[in-house]
Amino acid sequence: IIINTILLINAISSVDDLIILFETKNSINISGYLNTKSQIIIDEKIHKGNSYQQSLVLDDFFDVSDVDRFKVIHRGGSENNLIYILGEYSSNTDIYKVLITLTKSEKELTIKKIKIDKKL
């Protein structure tokens, strides 16, 4: 029980760290949670690639959308070590819905998908 609690605390801390990276729009460090199987989907366009290429996709989104705030709406987990974060990026004129899904192994969190859609 103690080991499971320690693993859960470490995973929660890592999720909190990841949320801070999204709040600060730190695409380079966000890309450290990505791998070549990860997807970034922005307004239905799917982006794949290595972590550097994916960091450029996020940089482009941050520059073009001019978002300045990230707010977590809900976060949770499910069976099979799947963790999700629902959030919103907002600018002065637009709001973007964000869904981040992650998998947790014994040693790390990996982003499976980042889905960003402009709210109409």
Cite the ranges covered by each PLM segment.
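Surface-exposed, charged secondary-structure patches
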Residues: 55-94
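Short solvent-exposed beta->alpha transition segments
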Residues: 32-71
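Bacterial N-terminal signal peptides
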Residues: 1-7
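Mature soluble domains of exported/periplasmic/lumenal proteins and thiol-rich metal-chelating peptides
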Residues: 52-53, 68, 75, 109, ...
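Exposed acidic/polar residues on beta-strands and adjacent loops within beta-sheet cores, strongest
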Residues: 28, 47, 71-81, 117-120
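Hydrophobic residues embedded in beta-strands of well-ordered beta-sheets
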Residues: 38, 81-83, 107-110
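Short, aromatic-enriched amphipathic alpha-helices that serve as compact interaction elements
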Residues: 11-26
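Short beta-strand edge/turn micro-motifs at domain boundaries
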Residues: 93-120
